[in-house]
Amino acid sequence: MQPFTTHTGLAVMIDSTNIDTDQIIPKQFLSKVTRDGFGVHLFHDWRYLDDAGDQPNPEFSLNQSRYKGASILLAQENFGCGSSREHAPWALVDFGLRAIIAPSFADIFYGNSINNGLLPVALTHAQVRQLMDEVAAEAGAQITVDLTSCKVISPSGAEFSFTLAESARHKLLNGLDAIGLTLSHAAQISQYETQIQGWRR
């Protein structure tokens, strides 16, 4: 998993509340069990005018040329609600997004994102609105997300602080998923195993 320390990137917005996981990655695309290849189906029902995905919707932000290559997504309250599909952060990451900034997130999506290297940043509604306004006002506007200092820097230079559980921050800073986190304690695990009776191993 790619570590997340500081990232500066082009920002794109979807100015909607309650964006659920079925909109993020519709159910008909969930048959794969590997993490790659989901980006093309991200927000399928909004990005395309046809079921086959051959006709991009020119009105949808992710299809607009000014947002091509965006790596930071701005959204509104309760992002990632709905069913607990881990494919949702897989699709967002595979598309090239590194961070989602919104006033609030669904709990399960929030945890799944951290476990897959996607940083969910919760700011106030007013702060998210300011970021959206600045991004809308200037093509190519970039936002910086600094996990080392837990700050977001807007295109105009305004700074907003955010909080993240230290355990989640540690995993993201070091690029550790659940397996990687366990392996980082391999020496302690081995030491413990030598201290217990054989029949208990």
Curated annotation (Swiss-Prot):
Annotated metabolic or biological route of this protein: Amino-acid biosynthesis; L-leucine biosynthesis; L-leucine from 3-methyl-2-oxobutanoate: step 2/4
GO molecular function, one term: 3-isopropylmalate dehydratase activity
EC top class, as a word: lyase
EC numbers, comma separated: 4.2.1.33
DNA damage in keyword set: no
Lineage: superkingdom: Bacteria
Entries under SUPFAM superfamilies matching the protein: LeuD/IlvD-like
Record has Lyase as a keyword: yes
CDD domains reported for this sequence: IPMI_Swivel (cd01577)
InterPro entries in UniProt: 3-IsopropMal_deHydase_ssu, Aconitase/3IPM_dehydase_swvl, AconitaseA/IPMdHydase_ssu_swvl, IPMI_Swivel, LeuD
Subunit composition and interactions: Heterodimer of LeuC and LeuD.
Protein family (similarity comment): Belongs to the LeuD family. LeuD type 1 subfamily.
Protein name: 3-isopropylmalate dehydratase small subunit
High-level lineage: Bacteria, Pseudomonadati, Pseudomonadota, Gammaproteobacteria, Alteromonadales
